[in-house]
């Protein structure tokens, strides 16, 4: 019927109730594929022309792609090999996105240093390195610069993490989104990329000081697992 479950709707009218179930034979299926591997990391498992709606909440494909790459490297994987795959931290979204960011020429010496760092980066998210921190802060600020004025603050805040494929599509196909509606000048995509870098670097400097060489991703990228009951005891 109406809607797809991605937004709140009046549940008492019946207009948005499910109309039925997907036939079992039409459910996505992969059985003993020729490649010998099955990979999923919450990424899309059906094509765009699949007739039934499953969800809008697919993960971006990068983890799925990377796991597939690693599994295809050798025919058999011992236990320690699977441990290495689980611990792999190559960022395929950085592989895709960094060249796009670096197309915008640096506008000051600090930006030039960052361009040099990211241009030589191997895209591994190592805790001891500055590059992962700079990259993540940059794309976070870039998404804000591209979308916050268009979507409004409330809707923008619903974007939990940077959406790299969406940003790449905007930069490639919808440059009108690069203009900041809150200013009197018409910004280009290069302007927004450069501005977002400055804001990212300023933000990191407030956290870790002005010395770029001393910055570390691991000091900001922390996973805290709190006990739901006893953490406050």
Predicted regions and their residues:
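Hydrophobic alpha-helical segments
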Residues: 1-74, 125-130, 138-148, 152-158
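Acidic, low-complexity N-terminal propeptides/linkers enriched in Ser/Thr/Asp/Gly that mediate export
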Residues: 7, 38, 86-233
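Glycine- and acidic
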Residues: 47-54, 77-87, 99-100, 181-183
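Stable alpha-helical elements in mature extracytoplasmic
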Residues: 63-70, 78, 97, 110, ...
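M16/insulysin-pitrilysin zinc metalloprotease superfamily fold
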Residues: 73-76, 105
